[in-house]
């Protein structure tokens, strides 16, 4: 799956793949964002972390993923609106992960140039959610 467009899926498609095809959902938002609400059953591995100038790329994102998943594991990555998950999917693909899908619209939804909602995210699509920290977090 090298074509970026073919690896982006809707929240409903992500949920279907989790329930019927055994895909793991990795929420790449910060720990605080994850704790406030996330897709039910998701794992939290932040691709960006707080730094001196705001959010910065996590130096150990790929190594944490390599420790948690086989390179051929079916994985969906998601974030708040779709930007960080695209970064995560790209990093994982470059590291040799072969079955990574990027959930477009993230948790909250995709926004247009004027801030209007253009596609509802997981939380707005009525899909199963939960809150709290990831007990598997490092």
Please identify what each model-predicted range represents.
Residues 1-23, 31-74, 83-138:
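Rhodanese-like catalytic fold shared by cysteine-dependent sulfurtransferases
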């Amino acid at each position: 799956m090298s074509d970026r467009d073919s690896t982006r899926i809707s929240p409903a498609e992500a949920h279907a793949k989790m329930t019927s095809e055994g895909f793991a959902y990795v929420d790449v938002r910060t720990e605080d964002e994850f704790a406030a609400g996330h897709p039910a059953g998701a794992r939290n591995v932040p691709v960006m972390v707080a730094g001196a100038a705001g959010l910065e790329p996590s130096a150990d994102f790929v190594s944490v993923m390599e420790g948690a998943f086989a390179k051929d594991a079916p994985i969906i990555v998601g974030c708040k609106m779709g930007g960080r998950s695209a970064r995560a999917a790209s990093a994982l693909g470059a590291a040799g992960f072969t079955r990574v899908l990027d959930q477009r619209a993230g948790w909250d939804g995709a926004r247009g140039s004027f801030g209007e909602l253009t596609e509802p995210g997981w939380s707005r699509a009525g899909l199963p959610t939960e809150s709290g920290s990831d007990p598997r977090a490092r």
